[in-house]
Structures are given as C-alpha cells and as structure tokens.
Amino acid sequence: MASQSQGIQQLLQAEKRAAEKVADARKRKARRLKQAKEEAQMEVEQYRREREHEFQSKQQAAMGSQGNLSAEVEQATRRQVQGMQSSQQRNRERVLAQLLGMVCDVRPQVHPNYRISA
C-alpha cells in the first residue's frame, strides 16, 4: 500500500512538473508573440515614417516648382500688361483721330443693289 501511495505521489509530482513546464512554455510563447507584435509594430511605424517623409519631399518638390512657375507666370503677365498699357498710350491719339475721321467724314454713295425705278 505504501508503494502505491508513493507511486501515486510520484505521478502527482510528475503531473505537477509537467503542468509547470506547459505553463512556462505558454508564458514564453506569449512573451515571444508580444515581442514579435511590438517589433512588427515598430517596423510598420518606421516604414510609415519613411513613406511619409518621401511623400513630403516629393510634394515639396512639386509645390516648389509650381510656386516658381506661378511667380514666373505672374511676372510675365505684368510685363504683358505694362506693354499693352504703353502701347495704348503711344497709339491713343492716332487711333482716336482715325476713328473720328471715319465717323465724321461721311461720303454719301448709292448702294450698288439699289435699283432706280422710274
């Protein structure tokens, strides 16, 4: 009877050690999973920062060149407007004289399609 009781005790102790080993293995697995998850999260975060930085640099390059283009277009527009204004000032008197001459110098003529019926 004592041997049976001793055998049962050994079995219980072995079962307890096995349960402890299984619990330890589960804890190690949980720690490894948690560590892997944290590492993956860090990698994702680093990749996201790299892509964001790349996007910002491309956007800055595009907007920078666009800003230069708008400044160039604005400057060219100002030059054209100034050219038109100076041309208007130079030709104003001549155009007015020509226009008044056409309006005031009336030469009556019979229209070519007019038929004299008599």
UniProtKB/Swiss-Prot annotation:
Residues 57-69, 78-89 have a biased composition (Polar residues). It is a peripheral membrane protein. Brain. One of its GO terms (cellular component) is synaptic vesicle membrane. Residues 25-90 are annotated as: Disordered. Residues 35-56 have a biased composition (Basic and acidic residues). One of its GO terms (biological process) is regulation of macroautophagy. It holds the Pfam family V-ATPase_G. It is found in: Melanosome; Cytoplasmic vesicle, Clathrin-coated vesicle membrane. Keywords: Cytoplasmic vesicle, Hydrogen ion transport, Ion transport, Membrane, Transport. Gene3D superfamilies: 1.20.5.2950. One of its GO terms (molecular function) is proton-transporting ATPase activity, rotational mechanism. Belongs to the V-ATPase G subunit family. V-ATPase is a heteromultimeric enzyme made up of two complexes: the ATP-hydrolytic V1 complex and the proton translocation V0 complex. The V1 complex consists of three catalytic AB heterodimers that form a heterohexamer, three peripheral stalks each consisting of EG heterodimers, one central rotor including subunits D and F, and the regulatory subunits C and H. The proton translocation complex V0 consists of the proton transport subunit a, a ring of proteolipid subunits c9c'', rotary subunit d, subunits e and f, and the accessory subunits ATP6AP1/Ac45 and ATP6AP2/PRR. Subunit of the V1 complex of vacuolar(H+)-ATPase (V-ATPase), a multisubunit enzyme composed of a peripheral complex (V1) that hydrolyzes ATP and a membrane integral complex (V0) that translocates protons. V-ATPase is responsible for acidifying and maintaining the pH of intracellular compartments and in some cell types, is targeted to the plasma membrane, where it is responsible for acidifying the extracellular environment. This is V-type proton ATPase subunit G 2. The gene is ATP6V1G2.
